[in-house]
Amino acid sequence: MILYEYPFNERIRTLLRLEDLFERFAFFLAQEDPREHHVALTTLFEIAEVTGRADLKSDLMKELERQRQTLAPFRGNPGIEQNALEAVLGEIEQTLANLAQMQGKTGQHLVDNEWLASIRSRAVIPGGTCKFDLPSYYAWQQWPAEQRRQDIAKWVAPLLPLRDAAAIVLRLARESGQASKVMAMQGSYQQMLSGRTYQLMQVRVPPELHVIPEASANKYMLWVRFTMQDGDVRPRAVDIDVPFHLTLCNL
């Protein structure tokens, strides 16, 4: 099944973007070629843009504290697997401590590094990081891969508590949902939400159908419409019945 996820609010939208950026960053950082490390570095700059939002850290700390207070009363409950509960609570508490230790404006260390700032300013220009534009950057790219990797890991380290916090919140949100098998008649599906508030919707579709879900929702109803990509033209609506799995997640 192919998984598509749709956020219902701006906070989850930001966390999904952050998750995607950190996954891309980790992939390219693990590679050897300097061009791949260039992608890792420019992705780090994107991460800094997202995490630089003033209220992100405080939002994450509030949500983790809320989850801690929700889960802590289940300690000693015989109906709850205690080892798993303690693992989650320990992870939340450690991440909260790491967030509390973050000092100053998020990502300021990248701004204060004049060399990185020069690369960042050139990276937004198409072809702006050529060797004749940034000879010192080109020289750094000739260093051994492990040394480059250590440098980039050092630069991302102050942002990792935000990555860990986002991962916990998204994981708890995803685990809160229960998948149901539904059918989009003639490619369209709608469901009343009865005023319930959700953070995330997951749509899983069989890959052999080659369909693409498009979703929208408000506090009363959600809609899923399936389209199909055919060559270079825009996706078109399908008129076949599409079976899929729908999960609504609510922290």
Curated annotation (Swiss-Prot):
Its assembly, as annotated, is: Interacts with FtsZ.
Q: What is its main location?
A: cytoplasm
**This protein's encoding gene:** zapD
Summarizing the function annotation, the protein's role is: Cell division factor that enhances FtsZ-ring assembly. Directly interacts with FtsZ and promotes bundling of FtsZ protofilaments, with a reduction in FtsZ GTPase activity.
The leader peptide range reads: none
Q: Native species of this protein? A: Burkholderia vietnamiensis (strain G4 / LMG 22486) (Burkholderia cepacia (strain R1808))
Keyword tags: Cell cycle, Cell division, Cytoplasm, Septation
GO cellular component term, pick one: cytoplasm
Q: Which Pfam families does the entry mention?
A: ZapD
Any one biological process term the GO annotation gives: division septum assembly
The family line of this record is: Belongs to the ZapD family.
Which named protein is this?
Answer: Cell division protein ZapD
The listed locations are: Cytoplasm
